[in-house]
Each structure stands twice: as C-alpha cells, then as structure tokens.
Amino acid sequence: TLFRSKYTMKTDRIDSVREQAKYEVGLEKFLSTNGIGAFADTFQDLHGLKQLPGIAAQNLMGKGIGFGPEGDYKISALSAVLMKMSEGKEGATGFIEDYTYDLTPGQELELASHMLEVPPAFAATKPEIDVIPLGIGGKEDPARLIFDGVTGDGIQVTMVDMGDHFRIICADIELVKQPKPMPKLPVARIMYRHKPNFQIGTAAWCYAGGAHHSVVSTALTRDDIAMFARLTGTELITIGEDTTEADLQKFFMK
C-alpha cells in the first residue's frame, strides 16, 4: 500500500516487489540497531538474497543512508556525509555513476545512472516500479524504480585514494532534461552538461583521477565542498567555468 501511494506500479509481479520491501526493512533495522549510516554491497556476494537490492537500496538512500555499489565504501561514506550536509537545503543529493555520453557536436551530454540503485531524490516525475531481468549477478529479476531526472545547476563529487592521502574532486555541472524518451533503458537516470565544456570538463575529471562512481547534488555548491575539504584536511580539485586547457597541463607537471 505504501509503495502504491508513492509510486506507479507498472508490474504485476508483486512478489518481486515484496521481496525488495523485506530487504529494505531488514537492512534499515540492522543499520539503525548498529548505528551505521552507510552501506555497500556487491552483486557477487549476496548470500541468501534472491535479488540484488534495487528498490530497497533506492528507498534507503531516500532516507539519507549512504550507499556504494560494488563494494565502493568511499562513495558510500561520501554520499552519507553530503546528504547530511544538504539537509534543509532545496535540491537533490545522491549516488550516481557515469554511464555513457551523447556526443552530438556542440551539445555533448553525459547520461548518468546505475543498473538499479539511483536515489528517488533525483526523480522529476512520479517513479514507476517495474521488474525487469538483470544480466549480471545470477539472481532473480529485481524490482526497481524508474524515472527521468531533475534539472538545474549542480555539482558532481567523488573521492579517490591517492595512496598516501584521499583526494576530493568537485565539478560544476548543469542537469538537463533528456533530449528524447528512453523507453528501452529500464533504469532511473539523470543527464547533465559538463563545465566549462565537454572536452575540458571530462579531461580534467579523468586527469584528476575521477572515478565513475560519484555523488551529484543540486542542493550543495562548490563552496560547500571546499568547506568540507578544509574541515577534514582533504585535498580538493575543482572543475568549472574557470577551468582552462592550461589547467589540464598541471596534472602532468612534477
């Protein structure tokens, strides 16, 4: 009943949806009991679970619990912190993954998504629940929320292990409406434009060591991340309208 009030049910495979609800309740109780604010999973090691957590992980992120897929503890922790920092602010914050690019000349965009676990905070419309096969993991078809993403100015933030220290990378982006419907992409997604442009923005992200898992926020700004980096003594690299081709050369200078 709760799911039907929040989401549009596109499937009649209710048992699969109930399975996700069990995961959500169980995980939330375990995390709460043990004072844990973030978690990660891997689709190779889900002993005793019939499905990879889809709606379960999505709804837990909607409650402010950090998540990282494929055992990515750094993004799990970072997303929990940034969601806490964004409380009381207007906008959305949550985990996302670089997926693919629209390389239309002069209109380049990035499509960001994940195989299941995109937080509902990014939904521009009422999310739909569907049960669709997943080609990896060797589990039953998982239920997931599907939606198109919000628009507006935002930031993309990741944290990488540099061996002797951590580095935070923060890039200014503009979230946009997807150019065309995507009926054959059965996952939630957002699309955004890199700043200052696609070529420099993506090159700077890669040269800085940017990961394909990140946190996107339309609630926080580069200044918020700079404050967090100062408070934690963490190296910070920023990318935005003020980034130039000359800045890219700094990554190759000793």
List PLM regions with ranges.
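Hydrophobic alpha-helical scaffolding
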Residues: K10-V17, K29, F67-G71, S214-T218
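A short, gly/pro- and small-residue-rich
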Residues: Q51-G68
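Extended hydrophobic packing segments that form well-structured cores
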Residues: K139-K254
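Accessory "access/gating" subregions that flank catalytic or transport cores
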Residues: S5-T11, S16-G48
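Conserved active-site and cofactor/substrate-binding residues in soluble primary-metabolism enzymes
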Residues: R18, K22-V25, N34, D72-A77, ...
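Flexible, glycine/charged-enriched surface loops at secondary-structure junctions
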Residues: T42, K89-E97, T238-T243
